[in-house]
Curated annotation (Swiss-Prot):
Residues 238-254, 364-389 have a biased composition (Polar residues). InterPro entries: SLX4IP (IPR031479). Interacts with SLX4/BTBD12; subunit of different structure-specific endonucleases. It comes from Mus musculus. This is Protein SLX4IP.
């Protein structure tokens, strides 16, 4: 009989275990007991050792007699996988103590020794073959040994349908994975009626339909937003988006400034007023505006010289306002086809004219302060204009002057 001795730690106690292995066969060989089976024996006896140590600690504190359990007369019997265990506790005649060191200062030796005898079970060849066949069948069918009652009862029809559906899903995912890893030509995919092609094509159709519906919904939302913000009719927006290529080319050839000029000439009253035949008063006003434009030109030259002298090439506020007014005047060509936009354009032009008139007044004042000669010329032009207006109709001063001249001539005679 081969014996092995080792210790098992349980709390603050070290339990000494005497393991005896009974030989098997005619040769009395104990090689059948491997190290793996030793670990199995320790796992099976771990709970028994823990309960015995706890019982001893309780008895020692309460000073009660120990129970006669797991003795030589009534040993513990357990069965493992292919072996039989017989174990009991035996009191030691000599008290042993652990060597005091830094690691196990509180470790004590358990006063009872645990004796374990292991023997191999005498199974026949037929019994081992039957057990192996049953275990392989259960492993193939996925049946667990812990739930034998579930394995014996047949599944319900609903459970069968669910299992079949899960198997089909697994099979399709595997087939898709193989198709992705091994791409094939389009002719083979069309010619074969495999499940992977049948499942992939409807998904692509659904995806394209979803994308088409999303694009249509987005276009409708854009049309509604344009209608609510700009108050444009929906039909005109749709016509703009559905124009023919020839129309778009003809629209692209014309510059936005030309569209603006043609639209404003046909609708703006200012250009109609300028196209009429000028009268005497209109000619005087035209001369006055030309004089103002000349003054503006001289003011711009002065500003340019001042910028060059100061080294600042940035725009003065007047130039910035003019560029802002020109930016307001220029509009895209597509927006000129709507009367509402043209009305807004006319309002913007009127506002720009007012700003230009204010700038001209400021420039004329600046010219008076800087160029007194030009100011005298403008004053003389205003005096001639006033005399011309006085000559248009007889006034009381002229009559008094004529009567005064007649009186003087009569006195001389």
């Amino acid at each position: 009989m081969a014996s092995k001795k080792f210790a098992v730690k349980c709390g603050n106690f070290a339990v000494l275990v005497d393991l005896h292995v009974l030989p098997q066969g005619s040769n009395r060989d104990s090689s059948w007991f491997s190290e793996q089976k030793k670990e199995e024996v320790c796992l099976l006896l771990k709970e028994t050792i823990d309960s015995r140590v706890k019982e001893y600690v309780g008895i020692y504190k309460q000073r009660k007699p120990s129970s006669a359990e797991f003795t030589r007369s009534s040993p513990l019997s357990l069965k493992g996988y292919g072996f039989q265990i017989t174990a009991y506790f035996l009191k030691r005649g000599i008290h042993l103590h652990c060597i005091q060191n830094s690691q196990n200062t509180e470790l004590r030796v358990f006063p009872e020794r645990f004796v374990v005898c292991v023997s191999q079970l005498a199974f026949g060849h037929d019994i081992w073959a039957n057990q192996n066949e049953k275990s392989t069948k259960k492993a193939l069918h996925g049946v667990s040994d812990y739930f034998p009652e579930c394995a014996e009862s047949s599944p319900s029809p609903g459970t069968k349908l669910k299992r079949n559906a899960l198997k089909e899903i697994v099979r399709r995912t595997k087939s898709k994975g193989t198709d992705v890893s091994k791409p094939q030509p389009s002719g083979d995919l069309v010619g074969r009626s495999s499940d992977s092609v049948i499942t992939v094509v409807p998904w692509r159709r659904d995806a394209s339909a979803i994308l088409l519906s999303e694009s249509v919904g987005q276009a409708q939302d854009d049309i509604r937003a344009a209608k609510s913000h700009q108050e444009l009719p929906v039909q005109k927006l749709e016509n703009v988006s559905q124009t023919q290529p020839g129309d778009t080319r003809s629209q692209q050839q014309l510059h936005p400034g030309e569209w603006l000029k043609t639209g404003l000439l046909s609708r703006s009253p200012a250009y109609n007023y300028e196209s009429a035949s000028p009268g005497p008063k209109q000619s005087l006003r035209a001369a006055k505006t030309q004089q103002k434009h000349r003054n503006c030109g001289s003011v711009e030259d002065c500003d340019h010289r001042r910028r060059v002298s100061l080294g600042n090439e940035g725009l003065v506020p007047e130039d910035a306002d003019r560029e802002r007014s020109t930016a307001v005047r220029v509009l895209p060509a597509l927006e000129l086809s709507d009367p509402g936009l043209l009305l807004k354009q006319d309002l913007a032009k009127a506002k720009a004219k007012e700003e230009l008139h204010a700038l001209e007044n400021l420039s004329s004042r600046h010219l008076v302060t800087n160029n007194p000669g030009q100011a005298q010329q403008s004053d003389s032009a205003a005096i001639t204009e006033q005399l011309a207006t006085d000559q248009g109709g007889p006034s009381k001063k002229r009559k008094k002057l004529q009567s005064y001249n007649r009186g003087c001539s009569g006195k001389k005679n």
